[in-house]
Protein backbone atom coordinates (compact mmCIF):
# COMPACT_ATOMS: atom_id res chain seq x y z
CA UNK A 1 0.00 0.00 0.00
CA UNK A 2 1.38 3.39 -1.03
CA UNK A 3 1.45 6.50 1.08
CA UNK A 4 -1.90 8.28 0.72
CA UNK A 5 -3.80 5.16 -0.36
CA UNK A 6 -6.95 4.25 1.54
CA UNK A 7 -7.24 0.72 2.81
CA UNK A 8 -10.31 -1.23 1.80
CA UNK A 9 -10.56 -2.66 5.34
CA UNK A 10 -10.98 0.70 7.11
CA UNK A 11 -14.74 1.13 6.52
CA UNK A 12 -15.46 -2.28 8.06
CA UNK A 13 -14.45 -1.12 11.55
CA UNK A 14 -17.43 1.20 12.07
CA UNK A 15 -20.14 -1.33 11.10
CA UNK A 16 -18.53 -4.02 13.28
CA UNK A 17 -18.34 -1.66 16.26
CA UNK A 18 -21.95 -0.62 15.70
CA UNK A 19 -22.97 -4.28 15.46
CA UNK A 20 -21.28 -5.12 18.75
CA UNK A 21 -22.86 -2.10 20.44
CA UNK A 22 -26.25 -3.09 19.01
CA UNK A 23 -25.83 -6.61 20.45
CA UNK A 24 -24.86 -5.09 23.80
CA UNK A 25 -28.01 -2.92 23.65
CA UNK A 26 -30.22 -5.96 22.95
CA UNK A 27 -28.71 -7.80 25.93
CA UNK A 28 -29.12 -4.63 28.01
CA UNK A 29 -32.82 -4.43 27.18
CA UNK A 30 -33.38 -8.11 27.93
CA UNK A 31 -31.58 -7.86 31.29
CA UNK A 32 -33.67 -4.82 32.23
CA UNK A 33 -36.85 -6.86 31.70
CA UNK A 34 -35.48 -9.66 33.89
CA UNK A 35 -34.49 -7.15 36.60
CA UNK A 36 -38.01 -5.67 36.46
CA UNK A 37 -39.44 -9.11 37.18
CA UNK A 38 -37.05 -9.59 40.11
CA UNK A 39 -37.75 -6.24 41.74
CA UNK A 40 -41.51 -6.28 41.28
CA UNK A 41 -41.66 -9.88 42.51
CA UNK A 42 -39.66 -8.99 45.60
CA UNK A 43 -41.77 -5.93 46.36
CA UNK A 44 -45.03 -7.86 45.96
CA UNK A 45 -43.82 -10.87 47.96
CA UNK A 46 -42.66 -8.71 50.86
CA UNK A 47 -45.54 -6.24 50.66
CA UNK A 48 -48.19 -8.95 50.94
CA UNK A 49 -46.54 -10.85 53.77
CA UNK A 50 -48.45 -11.27 57.01
CA UNK A 51 -49.36 -14.09 59.34
CA UNK A 52 -51.66 -14.24 62.37
CA UNK A 53 -51.34 -16.76 65.17
CA UNK A 54 -54.10 -17.37 67.72
CA UNK A 55 -52.86 -17.39 71.31
CA UNK A 56 -54.87 -19.37 73.87
CA UNK A 57 -58.17 -17.83 72.83
CA UNK A 58 -59.57 -16.34 69.70
CA UNK A 59 -59.52 -12.87 71.29
CA UNK A 60 -55.76 -12.69 71.73
CA UNK A 61 -53.76 -13.01 68.55
CA UNK A 62 -50.21 -12.32 67.49
CA UNK A 63 -49.68 -10.87 64.05
CA UNK A 64 -46.53 -10.49 61.99
CA UNK A 65 -46.64 -8.27 58.93
CA UNK A 66 -44.01 -6.55 56.86
CA UNK A 67 -45.18 -3.04 57.79
CA UNK A 68 -44.30 -3.66 61.45
CA UNK A 69 -40.62 -3.37 60.58
CA UNK A 70 -39.25 -0.19 58.94
CA UNK A 71 -36.49 -2.19 57.23
CA UNK A 72 -39.08 -4.22 55.35
CA UNK A 73 -41.03 -1.08 54.43
CA UNK A 74 -37.81 0.45 53.08
CA UNK A 75 -37.13 -2.79 51.18
CA UNK A 76 -40.54 -2.62 49.47
CA UNK A 77 -40.11 1.08 48.66
CA UNK A 78 -36.58 0.57 47.31
CA UNK A 79 -37.68 -2.31 45.07
CA UNK A 80 -40.67 -0.29 43.83
CA UNK A 81 -38.47 2.72 43.00
CA UNK A 82 -35.89 0.57 41.20
CA UNK A 83 -38.62 -1.28 39.31
CA UNK A 84 -40.17 2.03 38.21
CA UNK A 85 -36.78 3.31 37.08
CA UNK A 86 -36.12 0.12 35.11
CA UNK A 87 -39.49 0.40 33.37
CA UNK A 88 -38.78 4.04 32.50
CA UNK A 89 -35.28 3.15 31.23
CA UNK A 90 -36.56 0.57 28.72
CA UNK A 91 -37.30 3.17 25.98
CA UNK A 92 -33.78 4.55 26.34
CA UNK A 93 -32.40 1.05 26.09
CA UNK A 94 -34.42 0.51 22.92
CA UNK A 95 -32.96 3.75 21.51
CA UNK A 96 -29.53 2.15 21.92
CA UNK A 97 -30.64 -0.75 19.73
CA UNK A 98 -31.70 1.69 17.01
CA UNK A 99 -28.77 4.10 17.51
CA UNK A 100 -25.85 2.03 18.85
CA UNK A 101 -23.47 5.01 18.86
CA UNK A 102 -25.51 7.07 21.34
CA UNK A 103 -23.12 8.23 24.03
CA UNK A 104 -24.78 10.66 26.45
CA UNK A 105 -27.79 8.44 27.00
CA UNK A 106 -25.43 5.59 27.92
CA UNK A 107 -23.70 7.88 30.42
CA UNK A 108 -27.14 8.70 31.81
CA UNK A 109 -27.90 5.00 32.21
CA UNK A 110 -24.54 4.27 33.86
CA UNK A 111 -25.11 7.07 36.36
CA UNK A 112 -28.69 6.14 37.25
CA UNK A 113 -28.08 2.38 37.14
CA UNK A 114 -25.34 2.94 39.72
CA UNK A 115 -27.66 5.04 41.89
CA UNK A 116 -30.38 2.39 41.66
CA UNK A 117 -27.85 -0.32 42.52
CA UNK A 118 -26.94 1.62 45.67
CA UNK A 119 -30.61 2.03 46.64
CA UNK A 120 -31.41 -1.62 45.98
CA UNK A 121 -28.33 -2.76 47.91
CA UNK A 122 -29.33 -0.63 50.89
CA UNK A 123 -32.89 -1.97 50.90
CA UNK A 124 -31.90 -5.61 50.44
CA UNK A 125 -29.16 -5.39 53.07
CA UNK A 126 -31.48 -3.83 55.64
CA UNK A 127 -34.10 -6.50 55.00
CA UNK A 128 -31.52 -9.31 55.03
CA UNK A 129 -30.36 -8.25 58.50
CA UNK A 130 -33.92 -8.44 59.86
CA UNK A 131 -34.56 -11.75 58.08
CA UNK A 132 -31.43 -13.13 59.76
CA UNK A 133 -32.69 -11.96 63.16
CA UNK A 134 -36.11 -13.49 62.48
CA UNK A 135 -34.46 -16.84 61.77
CA UNK A 136 -31.66 -16.86 64.34
CA UNK A 137 -32.54 -14.21 66.90
CA UNK A 138 -29.89 -12.59 69.08
CA UNK A 139 -29.44 -14.14 72.50
CA UNK A 140 -27.26 -11.31 73.84
CA UNK A 141 -29.90 -8.70 73.02
CA UNK A 142 -32.75 -10.97 74.21
CA UNK A 143 -34.26 -11.07 70.73
CA UNK A 144 -35.73 -14.46 70.08
CA UNK A 145 -36.24 -16.16 66.76
CA UNK A 146 -39.83 -15.84 65.56
CA UNK A 147 -39.60 -18.32 62.71
CA UNK A 148 -40.66 -21.31 64.80
CA UNK A 149 -44.04 -19.62 65.32
CA UNK A 150 -44.39 -17.61 62.10
CA UNK A 151 -43.03 -20.10 59.58
CA UNK A 152 -45.07 -18.86 56.59
CA UNK A 153 -44.06 -15.26 57.31
CA UNK A 154 -40.40 -16.23 57.48
CA UNK A 155 -40.55 -18.22 54.25
CA UNK A 156 -42.08 -15.26 52.40
CA UNK A 157 -39.65 -12.67 53.71
CA UNK A 158 -36.69 -14.94 52.96
CA UNK A 159 -37.96 -15.67 49.46
CA UNK A 160 -38.53 -12.01 48.69
CA UNK A 161 -34.81 -11.35 49.09
CA UNK A 162 -33.94 -13.63 46.16
CA UNK A 163 -35.41 -11.43 43.43
CA UNK A 164 -33.85 -8.34 44.91
CA UNK A 165 -30.35 -9.82 45.13
CA UNK A 166 -30.71 -11.20 41.58
CA UNK A 167 -31.68 -7.71 40.38
CA UNK A 168 -28.57 -6.34 42.11
CA UNK A 169 -26.39 -8.74 40.12
CA UNK A 170 -28.22 -7.76 36.92
CA UNK A 171 -27.65 -4.07 37.62
CA UNK A 172 -23.92 -4.73 38.03
CA UNK A 173 -23.96 -6.50 34.65
CA UNK A 174 -25.93 -3.62 33.09
CA UNK A 175 -23.41 -1.07 34.38
CA UNK A 176 -20.57 -3.19 33.02
CA UNK A 177 -22.26 -3.54 29.63
CA UNK A 178 -22.85 0.21 29.35
CA UNK A 179 -19.25 0.92 30.33
CA UNK A 180 -18.09 -1.61 27.73
CA UNK A 181 -20.21 0.04 25.03
CA UNK A 182 -18.85 3.46 25.98
CA UNK A 183 -15.26 2.20 25.97
CA UNK A 184 -15.66 0.73 22.48
CA UNK A 185 -16.22 4.21 21.08
CA UNK A 186 -12.59 5.21 21.67
Curated annotation (Swiss-Prot):
Main location: membrane
Top-level taxonomic group: Eukaryota
One Gene Ontology term, aspect cellular component: plasma membrane
Residues in the Cytoplasmic compartment per record: 1-23, 95-106, 182-186
Single GO BP term: cell wall organization
Keyword tags: Cell membrane, Cell wall biogenesis/degradation, Glycoprotein, Membrane, Transmembrane, Transmembrane helix
Positions of glycan attachment: 50
Compartment annotation: Cell membrane
Membrane topology listed for this record: Multi-pass membrane protein
Extracellular side: 45-73, 128-160
Residue ranges crossing the lipid bilayer per the database entry: 24-44, 74-94, 107-127, 161-181
Listed InterPro entries: CASP/CASPL, CASP_dom, CASPL
Family affiliation: Belongs to the Casparian strip membrane proteins (CASP) family.
Entry function: Regulates membrane-cell wall junctions and localized cell wall deposition. Required for establishment of the Casparian strip membrane domain (CSD) and the subsequent formation of Casparian strips, a cell wall modification of the root endodermis that determines an apoplastic barrier between the intraorganismal apoplasm and the extraorganismal apoplasm and prevents lateral diffusion.
Quaternary structure (record): Homodimer and heterodimers.
PANTHER family associated with the record: CASP-LIKE PROTEIN, CASP-LIKE PROTEIN 1U1
The protein's name in its UniProt record: Casparian strip membrane protein 6
Organism name: Oryza sativa subsp. indica (Rice)
Amino acid sequence: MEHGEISSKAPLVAPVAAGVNRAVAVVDTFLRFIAIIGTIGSAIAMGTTNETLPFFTQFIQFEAKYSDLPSFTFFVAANAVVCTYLVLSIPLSIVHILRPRARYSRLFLVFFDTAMLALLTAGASAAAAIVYLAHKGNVRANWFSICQQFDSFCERISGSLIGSFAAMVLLVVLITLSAFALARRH
